[in-house]
Amino acid sequence: ETLVTEVRLEHPRLGLELICHDAVDHVHPVYFRTVEVFDRRGRDRDVRVFFHHDISVNESATGDTENYDPRTKGLVHYKDDTYFLINGRNDAGWGIDQWATGQKRIGDAEGTWRDAEDGLLGRNPIAQGSVDSTVGFNLTVPPNGKANLVYWLAAGRTYSEVAGLDDRIRTSSPQRMIDRTEAYWKMFGDIRRPDLEEIDEDIRDLFVRSLLVVRTQIDDGGGIIAANDYDITHMGGDTYSYVWPRDGALVANALDQVGRHAVS
């Protein structure tokens, strides 16, 4: 009933379990992922969690820059007027613990994810051109206990804008922003109509889920796209993220019928 996911991962051989929650803030351009790491072996664990970023800023891998930012203790990807700030915190404090910046798909360069295979990133401070990055968090998990981290990616038009979002996240707290987003989407899907009260619960759940999925295909400016589908780029070199007047009108009409006029 909300656009906050829950994903559970288990590795029996390592004796670890992860619970992840993903959300995009409903007000600000920030993506969050929380990760809880549980020990299932009854002993102290030293765990490294890595996030890899293959960003082609403004849809081109040419002329990108990425650098470690001492002010925020995060990593910044940018080109022209498009900026992404990658950051997080674990139980020990704010900021990333490790990072790697480097070339991707240039000669023999496969990408910085290779640097994570030994559990230690090289901390190169800056890279330019066709680049990618990896950030890492060091976690100490007690026996039969858990460790926590939250990761975020903020988007903006200037460095000041993304750094300001980072400050806002620290002031408000990531979990508070995620909880607020979860509550907002629950309210969006909570449509109180007599005809909905009479249908089976599984059908009503499908209705709410469908309403939320439809909302993910609509821009805050009002554009209703046909399908936010990217996999056809590999086959046809195109997406289906077009705003068709007919399709948009049908969706807007359906939203009007359930009282979501602000979106339609």
Question: Residue locations for each model-derived region?
Answer:
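Extended polysaccharide-engagement surfaces of secreted carbohydrate-active enzymes
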Residues: E1
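Acidic/polar, glycine-enriched structural segments that form the non-catalytic walls/loops
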Residues: P12-I19, A23-F32, E36-T239, H261-V263
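Well-ordered alpha-helical segments within folded domains of soluble proteins
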Residues: R209, Y242-Q257, H261-S264
